[in-house]
């Protein structure tokens, strides 16, 4: 039986728990202390808290780091409450929202810091999902998402179809298990588990097999079409079941992959315009993170906060 999708923390509860900057700062320190503070200089894990400096001092080497250091907020001058509001909205809404909308809601003068804030959080989401591999029966296919033409391609003649400069290639994988004891006119219904979406530069078999090896357990079974891009999958997983799939049958043979692609495209089209190819992965990170944690409810806020305080800032 399908689990009920739980609702996240509502706005009234959020405002009650985090009414001001001070409450957000105190809670952020609680998250850091719970996860453990590590000295970036010597690796020490015991620290003094210097209230007057709002910083940690390593008991081993004496070096200090601020409350924000080595977290998603590293180097940010934005208020703690901005970050808490953004994390609340990202984890409590089914759809996404733009940086321009968040900027408007916060009443902040500059767009760029808010844009960076959201992309850092989306990168945190992606890093978290990288820790887990898919298992069982996996549907696998590629999707093509509309993005801006890269600068180095703008002067070249526009290609059509899958090779268009306005399309970014995405490898999509979904755990898909038949529901026991149930049948429909189209066959056995399938229940989805977790999904992954990874932006790729090409459809070479080496590229696909490498990503499959890093994201799917060896004991899994992979279902796909008979594209030559997938010829090496049989060497990566326990079983690779490929077949010729007519275009109008894709939704029946690989249902969850194409539901995920369709829903992700709809989310992007509804909110964003002219997505740069280099940032598409971050938007897909958000989509997959929410989908994979659709049963977490209010716990999703805590999960993203925990991931944020342990995040090693590598955003470019």
PLM segments and residue spans:
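Residue-level recognition of single "structural anchor" positions
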Residues: 1-316
């Amino acid at each position: 039986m399908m689990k009920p999708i739980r609702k996240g923390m509502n706005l009234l509860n959020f405002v009650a728990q985090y009414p001001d900057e001070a409450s957000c700062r105190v809670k952020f320190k609680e998250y850091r202390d719970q996860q453990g503070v590590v000295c970036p200089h010597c690796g020490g894990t015991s620290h003094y808290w210097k209230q007057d400096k709002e910083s940690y001092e390593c008991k081993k080497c004496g070096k200090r780091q601020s409350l924000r250091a080595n977290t998603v907020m590293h180097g940010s001058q934005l208020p703690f409450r901005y970050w808490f509001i953004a994390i609340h909205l990202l984890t409590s809404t089914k759809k996404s929202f733009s940086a321009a909308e968040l900027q408007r809601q916060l009443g902040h003068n500059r767009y760029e810091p808010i844009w960076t804030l959201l992309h850092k959080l989306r990168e945190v989401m992606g890093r978290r999902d990288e820790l887990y591999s898919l298992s069982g029966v996996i549907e696998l296919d590629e999707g093509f998402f509309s993005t801006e033409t890269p600068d180095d391609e703008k002067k070249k003649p526009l290609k059509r179809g899958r090779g268009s400069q306005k399309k970014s290639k995405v490898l999509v994988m979904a755990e898909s298990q038949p529901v026991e004891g149930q049948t429909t006119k189209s066959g056995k219904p399938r229940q989805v588990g977790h999904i992954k979406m990874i932006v790729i530069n090409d459809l070479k078999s080496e590229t696909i097999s490498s990503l499959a090896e890093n994201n799917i357990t060896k004991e899994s079974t992979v279902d796909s079409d008979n594209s030559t891009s997938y010829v090496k999958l049989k060497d990566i997983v326990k079983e690779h079941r490929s077949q010729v799939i007519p275009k109008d049958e894709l939704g029946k043979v690989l249902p969850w992959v194409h539901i995920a692609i369709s829903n992700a495209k709809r989310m992007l089209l509804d909110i964003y315009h002219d997505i740069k190819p280099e940032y598409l992965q971050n938007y897909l990170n958000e989509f997959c993170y929410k989908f994979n944690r659709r049963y977490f409810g209010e716990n999703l806020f805590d999960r993203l906060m925990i991931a944020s305080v342990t995040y090693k800032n590598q955003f470019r």
